Amino acid sequence: SGGLDKAFSRVGSQFEKEAHLKGLIIKSAIYPVILILVIIVVVAIMMIKIVPTFTSQFDEVGGKLPGITLAVMAVSDFFVHSWYFIVAIIAGIAIFIHAWKKTESGAHILGKFILKVPLVGPLSIKTASSRMTRTLSTLMGSGVQLVDALGLVTEMMGNAVVKQALKDATEEVSRGIPLSKPLADSGVFPPMVYHMIEIGEETGNMEDMLDKVAAYYDEEVESATEALLAAMEPLIIIVMAVIVVPIVLAIMMPMYSLYDSIGA
């Protein structure tokens, strides 16, 4: 009974940690997502409503328009008259990517790409390291054999590259190879993960070592999430400026020219 209570306690703690990390990532993503939606709405309003209004006024006045104005007017006209084409392209790309990432090669390429993206890649690895070590510790502490525990952990991983590394590790462990070796050979997990596991293997204290690694990477995930958010905010604002400023200039430049001609 005491062993069962301990197992349930470990599983409960596991779920709490998972929920906390998931909530942290979702909470951190809310603000950037809102900013991106605002950019999309602002640009759509400017291109569909505001620019066409000024375009009709410029046509009435006549005269030569700056190149940037002509370019923005052309894009605006395309938005207004071919919006369904844009929606179809976006929907087609989304459907293609959704289907492609479900294929083995697509999932692997996408997983590899994500791991190479600055800030996002390290966050993914730290999240996977935290999840893997904590779940392994929980399962082993509940009496599950290492090979079986690795099989369950592998299925939990979302990144195909991480999943493949754990599949390979499971095969190696089933042949009697210590877990630390295939993890080190994979090139996916940070040195601290397999070094601490190696210490656990040598001392026979694997569960405690896994718990320590999980606790360390829990904090690392929080720090990496905050760093990613801090980097995304100014980047999104810069992208917004790069998109919106040319549109504003395209509208204002002919107006200033018109005012100058009237004043003259």
Language-model region placement:
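Alpha-helical membrane-embedding segments
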Residues: 84-105, 139-156
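Conserved functional loop/turn residues at catalytic and ligand-binding sites
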Residues: 118, 143, 254
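Short acidic-hydrophobic sequence patches enriched in Asp/Glu that either
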Residues: 67, 71, 105, 109, ...
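Membrane-cytosol interface motif
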Residues: 63-73, 111-128
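Bilayer-spanning, highly hydrophobic alpha-helical transmembrane segments
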Residues: 20-99, 219-264
